[in-house]
Amino acid sequence: MISSKASDYQQRIGYVFTDPSLLLQALRHRSAGTPHNERLEFLGDSVVNLLIAEALFQRWPRADEGALTRARSELVRETSLASIARTMQLGEQLILGPGELKSGGHRRDSILADAVEAVIAAIYLDADLATCRTVVLPWFETALTALPVGKPEKDPKTRLQEWLQARQWSLPVYELIFESGDPHTKHFRVSCTLGELKLRTEGEGSSRRLAEQDAASHAIDQLDSNK
């Protein structure tokens, strides 16, 4: 039986489930027991990549493969999916175990992004690909239209490196602060240090690479604010 809170949430995401248990599974983190959302996350990752690839292919008829790939990566990266989750207030709906609740798991990018993918898979399984496309693509519309046609924004590490190289300054140094979690729920915190600028930022993510991107993004924000 689905709760009234989850029932209301279906209206927010724009889809009412025939099988509400799929939504409940999509919202249940592995820390809260089974059935949890990891299998749905696996499927949802492929579905969202297909939907975004298809949308970009149709909207950018002159873009080459490289531009399309970079654009898709920008739209489906962890921070982008987590932003969608926050817009939909998905964190408030997550079913988490006591440990994740205590540590603020409902605010963590990796958990939010995984849940978005799981919800997408749940919609796909409950209906079909066409319905999933109709429901899900509007979630990405703002980000899709914001991308410069054929020239998606480079990732934060590349942008930061190019900014420093243009000024002939040393490249940033990334260091692992800590990692936690089991192999399926790893969490990383990384620092980014700019020696000449005496600037140090930190970032988090479900992989070291994502944590470094997050730290670089924070460094760019700091540099922009100091202009």
Swiss-Prot record:
Mg(2+) binds at E41, D114, E117. It is found in: Cytoplasm. The keyword rRNA processing applies. Residues 6-128 form the RNase III domain. Pfam families: dsrm (PF00035), Ribonucleas_3_3 (PF14622). Residues 203-227 are annotated as: Disordered. Its EC number is 3.1.26.3. Its cofactor is Mg(2+). It catalyses: Endonucleolytic cleavage to 5'-phosphomonoester. Residues 155-225 form the DRBM domain. The active site is at D45, E117. Residues 203-212 have a biased composition (Basic and acidic residues). It is an enzyme of class 3 (hydrolase). The keyword Magnesium applies. One of its GO terms (biological process) is rRNA processing. GO terms for molecular function: double-stranded RNA binding; metal ion binding; ribonuclease III activity; rRNA binding. Homodimer. NCBIfam families: RNaseIII. Digests double-stranded RNA. Involved in the processing of primary rRNA transcript to yield the immediate precursors to the large and small rRNAs (23S and 16S). Processes some mRNAs, and tRNAs when they are encoded in the rRNA operon. Processes pre-crRNA and tracrRNA of type II CRISPR loci if present in the organism. This is Ribonuclease 3. It comes from Xylella fastidiosa (strain Temecula1 / ATCC 700964). The gene is rnc.
